[in-house]
Swiss-Prot record:
<keyword id="KW-0694">RNA-binding</keyword>
<keyword id="KW-0547">Nucleotide-binding</keyword>
<dbReference type="Pfam" id="PF13959">
    <property type="entry name" value="CTE_SPB4"/>
</dbReference>
<keyword id="KW-0347">Helicase</keyword>
<comment type="similarity">
    <text>Belongs to the DEAD box helicase family. DDX10/DBP4 subfamily.</text>
</comment>
<feature type="region of interest" description="Disordered">
    <location>
        <begin position="28"/>
        <end position="71"/>
    </location>
</feature>
<dbReference type="Pfam" id="PF00271">
    <property type="entry name" value="Helicase_C"/>
</dbReference>
<dbReference type="InterPro" id="IPR014014">
    <property type="entry name" value="RNA_helicase_DEAD_Q_motif"/>
</dbReference>
<feature type="compositionally biased region" description="Low complexity">
    <location>
        <begin position="43"/>
        <end position="56"/>
    </location>
</feature>
<feature type="domain" description="Helicase ATP-binding">
    <location>
        <begin position="111"/>
        <end position="287"/>
    </location>
</feature>
<dbReference type="InterPro" id="IPR027417">
    <property type="entry name" value="P-loop_NTPase"/>
</dbReference>
<protein>
    <recommendedName>
        <fullName>DEAD-box ATP-dependent RNA helicase 32</fullName>
        <ecNumber>3.6.4.13</ecNumber>
    </recommendedName>
</protein>
<keyword id="KW-0378">Hydrolase</keyword>
<feature type="short sequence motif" description="Q motif">
    <location>
        <begin position="80"/>
        <end position="108"/>
    </location>
</feature>
<dbReference type="GO" id="GO:0003723">
    <property type="term" value="F:RNA binding"/>
</dbReference>
<feature type="region of interest" description="Disordered">
    <location>
        <begin position="699"/>
        <end position="755"/>
    </location>
</feature>
<dbReference type="InterPro" id="IPR025313">
    <property type="entry name" value="SPB4-like_CTE"/>
</dbReference>
């Protein structure tokens, strides 16, 4: 059994830590780098600067901290190893046990400035070690401040999603396990909110999502970060500071102290003054270690693009998986319904490799279990963009993007799931012919993305549309899921802001029908996109009054050309249609507008007048609310008859009275007296009837009690003999008898029987008296 430490040993430990902190602070102040400086690149022959040898020559105390007697504090702004930094012994031991010895470029550039207490805005390629670049400063900051459980929250790390927050928390556990700090991972969509509220005030480090943290700030008792918080870290800062998290982040930052250290890291960093002012960055150090690099992606990443028609994407994906059964593949799709549908269908078709899917609607524990299973061996993971940022999985061989990303930054984050930490990886993206503009943007000089075009091998392309259709017949629920996948994909394309790449009008009706057939659907689902007129392409607007459209706030329907509408087989499902039912049948459009989307045009008046866009309401039209004129004079209500003529307000309910009709008051009073007399007679009858009913109820109750008493007496007579008979006779003499009027004959017979019995008893007594005499 381990013996507890004595008070003297604990005191010696505190003194030793105080001396170490004092030496570390002196070292940091003496050797801190100048603002705006960056470490020089390392030469291949040496792994550390020249002054590293002097630092290793015995000018160290215990654990690698320079002793006070040495009188020197080596510079650490250009070191290459973690043990050359002014770090505590506990942090160095944790790094060594976790296997971290050499620093990456972002760590060499960011750690010296972060250890000095400066705000840092860091950007580096995916997989370059950004997480460790802020974990170490957090641990050292709290250690030098002698932070303990009673001090409360000292650091908050914000993450855009649950999975990345869990990954950051694991790094804190590995590196800081020798420290005595308490840490918690606080994310949404998981159970245990009450348990979190009970312990959150005792936590020193919180790794959380903005929404969950804001919930605790508003609901948890005594949870206050306005005075004690020391350091704020935002990972994937460009996404956290995006408009999707804007309100949450602003509310969180408003409750934090103004004096603090702030660290921001991401692969695609923002330098917007407005965004940086929101998190109160003060004179930050801008660190972009790969800013001068020739590529924005890792050098070990091979990137390919393939032009694939929309209806051939699933066939191409299936063929690709069948040719790479010994690989670990990550597949990105644009919507949750697509992920579910492709996963379920491919699972039924059995490609010969394990399949998994992950999306944002899963519980946090389920997501963690799926990630752990995906790390084990060869597998295919279908995912939404929840997996695109920050998650670290080793040895991902291929990243396949079936759907086009919304921008260059998302593309970089997606392909960054492979080729991490100088390992090799490959990425492939499927682009429709209508999306070739994205390929031009990827190959542009400012993007720095070396991507190669790869032609599909049609000979090895496997057609699985019929197989998918047979699966949908066997599993009807998958057919509904396929319809939703079809709708959500078109909706995702329609809602994208970059219309140079995502323009739904470039797709023809044949494309939609073929895409639905590739999903195994027997008919093409109907969808309705309601949009404002400002989203209608200008080349399809003709002579429409643009100024009038800008003033209008009513929704407008974008419909498909009626000439191409006949090529589709309509579906009677519960999906809205992309086009409304046409009000006119004679619609003539130019040949160049066939099979494309164009604004609905009214043909009510076509006599040499410019065509105007007809405003169509939604399926359920709401009635316009009428306003009451409060300034109108009283008594001015107006009503109309069936012919539209004005009538007095109460004329419609008044009775028409002839001119010869006269009201007779005597007849009215006579009728009233007659009714009163009838009511009095009925009252008398009702009272008599009520009395009779009460009398019968009372009699029935008495008879019931009598029968019960007689039964008890009969039972007692069997046990007590003649004594019981005497009691019965006595009781019968003193009690009254009640008989119904309908049973008079029975009562007379009973009286005769009683007289005979009395005579017999008297005779028996007489005989007994003679015998005794």
């Amino acid at each position: 059994m381990r013996r507890p430490r004595s008070r003297g040993a604990a005191k010696q430990t505190r003194l030793r830590e105080a001396d170490e902190i004092r030496l570390l602070e002196a070292w940091i102040d003496a050797g801190k780098p100048a603002r705006g400086t960056r470490p020089p690149p390392l030469s291949k022959s040496s792994s550390s600067p020249a002054d590293t040898a002097a630092a290793k020559r015995g000018a160290k105390g215990a654990g690698g901290v320079p002793s006070k007697a040495a009188g020197e504090h080596p510079e650490y702004g250009a070191c290459a190893r973690f043990d050359e930094l002014p770090l505590s012994n506990k942090t160095k031991d944790g790094l060594r046990k976790a296997g971290y010895t050499e620093m990456s470029e972002i760590q060499r550039a960011a750690l010296p400035h972060a250890l000095c207490g400066r705000d840092v805005l860091g950007a580096a390629k995916t997989g370059s070690g950004k997480t460790l670049a802020f974990v170490i400063p957090v641990l050292e900051k709290l250690y030098r401040e002698r932070w303990g459980p009673e001090d409360g929250v000292g650091c908050i790390v914000l993450s855009p999603n649950k999975d990345l927050a869990g990954q950051i928390f694991n790094v804190f556990q590995k590196v800081g396990k020798l420290h005595g700090f308490s840490a918690a991972c606080i994310v949404g969509n998981r159970k245990g909110l009450d348990e979190e509220k009970a312990v959150i005030n005792n936590m020193n480090i919180l790794v959380c999502t903005p929404g969950r943290l804001l919930q605790h700030m508003g609901e948890t008792t005594n949870f206050d970060c306005s005075q004690i918080q020391q350091i704020l870290v935002i990972d994937e800062a460009d996404q956290v500071l995006d408009k999707n998290f804007q309100e949450q982040v602003d509310n969180v930052v408003s409750q934090l102290p103004k004096v603090r250290q702030t660290l921001l890291f991401s692969a695609t960093q923002t330098k917007s003054v407005k965004d940086l002012a929101r998190v109160s960055l003060k004179d930050p150090e801008y660190i972009s270690v790969h800013e001068e690099a020739t590529t924005a992606t890792p050098d070990t990443l091979e990137q390919y693009a393939m032009i694939v028609p929309l209806e051939q994407k699933l066939n191409m994906l299936w063929s690709f998986i069948k040719r790479h059964l010994k690989s670990r593949i990550l597949v990105f799709l644009s919507s949750v319904k697509q992920v579910k549908f492709v996963y379920e269908v491919f699972k039924k078709l059995r490609p010969g490799i394990s399949l998994r899917c992950m999306h944002g609607r899963m519980k946090y524990e389920v997501q963690q279990a799926i990630v752990a299973e995906f790390k084990e061996g060869h597998s295919v993971l279908f995912s939404t963009d929840i997996f695109a940022r920050g998650l670290d999985i080793e040895d991902v061989d291929w990243v396949v993007q079936v759907d086009c990303p919304e921008n260059i930054a998302l593309y970089i984050h997606r392909v960054g799931r492979t080729a991490r930490y100088n390992k090799r990886g490959k990425a492939l993206i499927f682009l429709c012919p209508e999306e070739e503009k994205m390929l031009e943007k990827l190959k542009a000089a400012e993007s720095k993305i070396p991507i190669h075009i790869k032609k599909p091998n049609t000979e090895q392309l496997q057609q699985i549309s019929q197989n998918i259709a047979s699966v949908l017949v066997q599993y009807p629920n998958l057919q509904q899921l396929g319809k939703r996948a079809f709708v959500t994909y078109l909706k995702s394309v329609y809602l994208q802001s970059d219309k140079e790449v995502f323009d739904l009008s470039r797709f023809s009706m044949e494309n939609f029908a073929a895409y639905a057939a590739s999903l195994g659907l027997p008919v093409t689902p109907k969808i309705r996109f309601v949009s404002h007129k400002k989203n209608v392409p200008k080349k399809y607007m003709g002579d429409i009054d643009v100024k009038r459209m800008k003033r209008s706030s009513k929704p407008e329907v974008i419909e498909i050309n009626p000439q191409a509408k006949s090529n589709l087989i309509e579906d009677d499902g519960d999906y809205d249609i992309l086009y409304p039912k046409e009000q006119q049948t004679d619609v003539n459009m130019a040949d160049g507008l066939d099979d494309v989307l164009y604004p609905k045009v009214s043909t009510a008046d076509t006599n040499n007048e410019p065509e105007k866009v007809t405003q169509l309401g939604n399926k359920s039209v709401k009635k316009k609310k009428l306003k009451i004129n409060v300034h109108r004079p009283l008594g001015t209500r107006v009503k109309f008859d069936d012919e539209g003529h004005t009538i007095p307000p109460f004329a419609s309910i008044a009775e028409e009275v002839g001119s010869g009709d006269v009201i007779d008051k005597d007849k009215i009073s006579q009728r009233y007296a007659e009714m009163l007399r009838e009511m009095q007679e009925h009252d008398k009858e009702d009272k008599l009837e009520h009395k009779r009913i009460l009398r019968e109820k009372k009699l029935q109750k008495k008879l019931k009690l009598k029968r019960k008493r007689n039964e008890e007496m009969d039972a007692g007579s069997e046990n007590s003999g003649s004594e019981s008979d005497r009691d019965q006779r006595t009781a019968s003499k003193g009690k009254k008898r009640y008989f119904n009027s309908d049973d008079e004959e029975g009562s007379k017979d009973a009286a005769k029987d009683g007289d005979v019995l009395a005579q017999q008893e008297a005779l028996a007594l007489k005989l007994l008296s003679k015998m005794h005499s």
